[in-house]
């Protein structure tokens, strides 16, 4: 289901632990990492889609997490043509996403990447809050940065800014 501009409605999930580290999932049989995300089905609310995707990709149930907040508006990214299925070319532009910030209230052992028959991830780790911005595939970078910035500024008081994180990383790498 695409909107008039060719964007597929989608939810993204930023799952954090008690140290404000983020869940970072390794895609099955690939060397790429990303946050859990997935499409919103017709008639499904973004929150319902978020809980479905959380279970399908991470194996967590609503009782394992607490919703801290969500982005106010849709964040969009365009998918490069060489990544688009042939039958979608010409009509599909990319994804528009509502992002949720969740806190894990369960335990690490509650994560089950094989909760469904078609897992999305075959590995995962906790990662520094801002690190995914520099590690995600290029065409998703601005959306990741936008979601992380909005959600941290609204819901995670005292969180180091991305600019401070990037400056510290730069000085550490000298």
UniProtKB/Swiss-Prot annotation:
What UniProt keywords apply to this chain's record, in alphabetical order?
A: Hydrolase
One GO molecular function term of this record is:
pyrophosphatase activity
Q: Does the keyword Hydrolase apply?
A: yes
Give EC number(s), comma-separated.
Answer: 3.6.1.-
Taxonomically, the superkingdom here is: Bacteria
What Pfam family does this protein match (any one)?
NUDIX
According to its UniProt entry, the function of this protein is described as: Accelerates the degradation of transcripts by removing pyrophosphate from the 5'-end of triphosphorylated RNA, leading to a more labile monophosphorylated state that can stimulate subsequent ribonuclease cleavage.
Name of this chain's protein: RNA pyrophosphohydrolase
- Identify the species of origin: Neisseria meningitidis serogroup A / serotype 4A (strain DSM 15465 / Z2491)
């Amino acid at each position: 289901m695409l909107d008039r501009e060719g964007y597929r409605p989608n939810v993204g999930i930023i799952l954090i632990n008690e140290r404000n580290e983020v869940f970072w999932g390794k895609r099955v049989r690939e060397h790429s990492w990303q946050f859990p995300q997935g499409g919103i089905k017709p008639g499904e609310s973004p929150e319902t889609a978020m809980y479905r995707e959380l279970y399908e990709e991470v194996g967590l149930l609503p009782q394992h997490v607490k919703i801290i907040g969500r982005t106010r508006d849709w964040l969009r990214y365009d998918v490069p043509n060489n990544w688009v299925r042939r039958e979608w070319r010409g009509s599909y532009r990319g994804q528009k996403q509502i992002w949720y910030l969740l806190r894990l209230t369960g335990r690490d052992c509650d994560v089950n990447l094989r909760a469904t028959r078609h897992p999305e991830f075959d590995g995962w780790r906790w990662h520094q809050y801002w690190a995914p911005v520099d590690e995600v595939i290029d065409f998703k970078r601005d959306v990741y940065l936008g979601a992380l910035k909005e959600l941290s500024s609204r819901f995670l008081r005292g969180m180091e800014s991305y600019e401070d994180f990037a400056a510290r990383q730069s000085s550490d790498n000298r």
